[in-house]
């Protein structure tokens, strides 16, 4: 397969490396090489099985709009753009494009989501979330923390779930879900030691997306089909 990776930062570079290791062809563009998604045209996307985006929220929206409008396939690991999700779904449906997005492409975090849904069923517990990331992460709270909160509230409607965010050094990503009762405390924790986990999930997602009919999927829905 041939993948076009958008973003040459730490995670984007790892995505390109992982894709090559898995035997795929890779082309890569940095944000400056694709200002306003201007480089995402028919000739650029010709022969590309999927685009993988790890850029920034505003750039990701422009990139998705361009790729989906051409009926292309795009995997988006960038977070912080979800206010535009309905618009992206509409473009994908209109132009027969394909979108796979997720607040976190780590398989371990996907398991954390499922465990959180199970723990949220406990009665008489109060829940809170703490997340820590590197100082260059643009969105706070993280998309993963927001997803964890949404999972808890889907099981326990109306419950308050405070999120505490920290930005420290080059932290790869730590999420802690705390369930506290009058009698005890239960914690679920995922601590990323390397961005490679996100890269592997994104590439596996792109491999999966390349074989699907047009549509829009959340990584949470498909990760165990990869």
Which sequence ranges carry the predicted segments?
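Structural motif
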Residues: 6, 54-55, 77-78, 102, ...
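Hydrophobic beta-strand scaffold residues
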Residues: 26, 74-75, 98-99
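Rossmann-fold NAD(P) dinucleotide-binding segment
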Residues: 41-50, 54-78, 86-88, 93
């Amino acid at each position: 397969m041939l993948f076009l990776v958008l973003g040459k930062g730490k995670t984007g570079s790892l995505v390109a490396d992982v894709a090559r290791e898995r035997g795929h062809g890779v082309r890569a563009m940095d944000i400056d090489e694709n200002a306003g998604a201007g480089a995402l045209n028919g000739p650029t996307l010709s022969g590309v099985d999927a685009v993988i985006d790890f850029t920034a929220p505003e750039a990701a929206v422009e990139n998705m709009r361009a790729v989906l409008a051409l009926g292309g396939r795009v995997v988006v690991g960038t977070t912080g753009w979800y206010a535009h999700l309905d618009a992206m779904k509409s473009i994908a449906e209109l132009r027969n494009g394909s979108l796979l997005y997720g607040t976190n492409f780590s398989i371990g975090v996907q398991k954390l989501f499922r465990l959180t849904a199970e723990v949220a069923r406990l009665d008489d517990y109060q829940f809170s979330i703490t997340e820590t990331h590197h100082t260059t992460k643009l969105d706070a709270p993280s998309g993963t923390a927001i997803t964890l909160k949404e999972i808890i509230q889907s099981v326990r409607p109306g419950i308050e779930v405070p999120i505490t965010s920290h930005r420290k050094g080059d932290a790869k990503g730590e999420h802690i879900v705390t369930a506290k009762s009058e009698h005890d405390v239960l914690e679920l924790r995922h601590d990323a030691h390397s961005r490679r986990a996100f890269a592997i999930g994104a590439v596996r997602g792109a491999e999966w997306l390349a074989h699907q009919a047009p549509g829009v999927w959340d990584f949470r829905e498909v990760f165990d089909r990869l």
